[in-house]
């Protein structure tokens, strides 16, 4: 099933306004992960990071930043931030990782990619 937008001038103007000024459909495209993410970041944490971006209520920046710190054992502290439309939120989660990590999710308009900052 293919979705087609209405072609009226009023709708086009409103659509452009929403897309330009409200973040519109940023991160609403194909999603990819790098080999490093696939090998080192457990699937449950990958899904959590994507969902944090999906549920963000402020205007989204093309670059989403996640600092993941091991508190003890499998207890993690995840700080999600962005620079444009400043945003910062810290949560705790459970996951099995061996080291602290910095993860980016970048939207290039055609697709979104999750990758390590290093």
Which role does the model predict for each range below?
Residues 2-93:
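N-terminal "domain-start" segment
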Residues 83-118:
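Short, compact, well-ordered microdomains
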